[in-house]
Amino acid sequence: HPQFDRIMNTIKSNILGDISYAHSMFSFPIKPARFYRIDRSMENGGGVLWDIGPYAIHTIRQCFKENPLRVKAIAKLNEHGADIATSGLIDFGNSKRATFDISFECTRRSEFEAFGALGRVKCPTVWQPEDKQAKIIINTESSGLTEEVVPAANHFVLEINHFNKVISSDIVPKLSSEDAFWNAKILESIQQSIKEDSWVNL
């Protein structure tokens, strides 16, 4: 989405300074029609971590050049062992860290914020409806607060078009297999941390 491209350009421009902290929050109140995600054995996966957790973690990771060193998480589990709310801390080393909160119990939200010594950038709605303009809030020590409007766009159409170009024009995909590997590795480590109630090294 052009909204996220603008955020990444803001971070890379260094007007915020080196990013030392990021936070993401993704949630929606789960409806009975979706209880299959949490109302069964978790042997084959399920719960909020594997549902909306990938978005929260991937969003955070884009702020840092490094892969994380360790994670710590806590969760609220139901009678099937499915996490319906999970919060955690990701340590990227060198005093760089991120927190996340994902839930099937909270009101709908898809928020993200990154902080540097010189400023911060906030995305109030990551999953912006295709028919609505997106908004980005930038607040720097030198220029103060500004709000930018990004043209409306359809996430899914953009994704499909990019996928088609990767195949037809042999271009490099925006997301690599290594990126996917690390996202899955972090999610698995978060799951392990919940189970063991401890820090887990990656």
PLM region spans:
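Short acidic, glycine-rich loop/turn motifs
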Residues: 90-94, 137-144
